[in-house]
Amino acid sequence: MKLTFIGATHEVTGSCYFLEAAGKRFLVDCGMEQGPDQYENQDVPVPMSDVDFALLTHAHIDHSGNFPLAYARGFRGPIYATAATCDLCDIMLRDSAHIQTFEAEWRNRKARRNGQPEFVPAYTMEDALNVIQQFVPCDYHKIIQLADGIKVRFVDAGHLLGSSSIEIWITEDGVEKKIIFSGDIGNTDQPLIKDPEYLESADYVVMESTYGDRSHGERPDYVQELVDILRRTFKRHGNVVVPSFAVGRTQEMLYFLRKIKADNMLPEFPDFDVYVDSPLAVQATNIFKEHYVDCYDEEAMELLNQGINPIAFPGLKLSITSDESRAINFDEHYKVILSASGMCDAGRIKHHLKHNLWRENSTIVFVGYQAVGTLGRALLEGAKDVRLFGEEIHVSAEIVRLSGISGHADNEGLMRWASAFKEKPQRVFVTHGEDTVCTLFAERLKNELGYDTYAPFSGTVFDLVNNVLEKETEGIIIEHAKEKAKARKASGVYARLVAAGHRLLAVIRHNEGGANKDLARFADQINSLCDKWDR
């Protein structure tokens, strides 16, 4: 009964885990890395043809995007996921294959001109279409017997339509262990979808830590923030360009924009158009309509019961063909453009950035996570010039981020999820976070909840029966990332300091109601320590 960590270890993208148990070999997630890699990922330690089946937490490409590659390498087993996840993967894996093929063709035109070897995409459309046939839809909350000694259950993670945490019960040689994969834990009070569910028992937990080092803060009024952005941009006769994940975030933005129009919150600009320039987003929106019973929250259901489509409104224009996409940039009227990809590394958004980044009157609004090394992250961090389609583009547009809007729980949301267990798990593995964040959040779980935590690197193997590391690995830094290694090491030490600060706050809370004399002495000791280091 072994667990091997493959991807999203000390990194955010590329989730993949390999389990050997009860005579079966299976994967949990098989994600594609997005943005430059920091560490090398080890391969699955057996031929893909020997993998019996897979489980998938949700449809985002950083969790599902390498299933076509697994197929190309021989994987033929079933992939179990919620019904909504299966439907979303149907369109998202096709889209991923299309983007890869398109990018390969573009790169190869340049390669041929320069006499360089051709670039081969990781997988083809045929691989994607074939692996889609292997998906098996599962209901939320239903325990499913996948094999002798292996049962699973999907519960709502509140991150994306169909997203799940997965409970796995494994029995081997009379020993039963329960392991939970958190998947991506959702933020609370998101539009359309339900909040994440909490789980109460597990022997082992594999937990994400995307925002394990930060708080979203007090929830802003996103609708009013959007109104303010639209008003000042439209007054400049500029466009509002929103790089948005086609699945999930685009539908949330449509939900907000519908409210702005329905409540006449921009009376001076009542006729503004909203373009959704993404065939994938259009398809995803239709899937959102199909799975509302299982996934929608009460507020969205109330609108539907009143006959109101929560993500449709006058002035909404869906762009599917390339000609329709190109025509958007010839429309001189102020407008909102929602386009993918959300991190600006692929898709039609790159064309809209090329046409709007140089314009002082336009605004680029980021509404989602931007991984290290992506174009979106560079723009958020103040890049003055960027390169698009071989052309240097000066950044003159206003760059804005809707603070706190996220499909991911922040550090407090993660702590709430982790603290729901009635008994301490034997071990909590912290993954799916940037390098220092994994370390920081593992320390916080240890200090505040008393959990035995570990932040593994790719290739680490854990014996689930005996609760011991069978193989411990160190992160292998990819060559281009070595220059950042010293900075990461320094920030890792700082992460320990921050974790110690969190522990101190927890100790202070634990002493509430203590004797005044003891509390006064404790306060004096803290102040003395602060005086020493406040320099």
Language model features: what each stretch is:
Residues 150-154, 287-295, 415-416, 465-477:
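Short, surface-exposed amphipathic charged segments that create phosphate/polyanion-binding patches used
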Residues 359, 434-479:
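C-terminal, active-site-flanking charged/polar segments
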Residues 387-418:
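Generic long, charged, amphipathic alpha-helical segments
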Residues 229-374, 386-387, 422, 437, ...:
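Hard-cation-handling environments
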Residues 1-55, 64, 71-252, 256-273:
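His/Asp/Glu-rich metal-coordinating catalytic cores
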Residues 191-206, 293-300, 370-396:
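Short, compositionally biased "basic patch" segments
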Residues 94-99, 103-106, 221-223, 256-261, ...:
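Short secondary-structure boundary/capping segments
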Residues 459-518:
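Charged, amphipathic alpha-helical linkers/stalks
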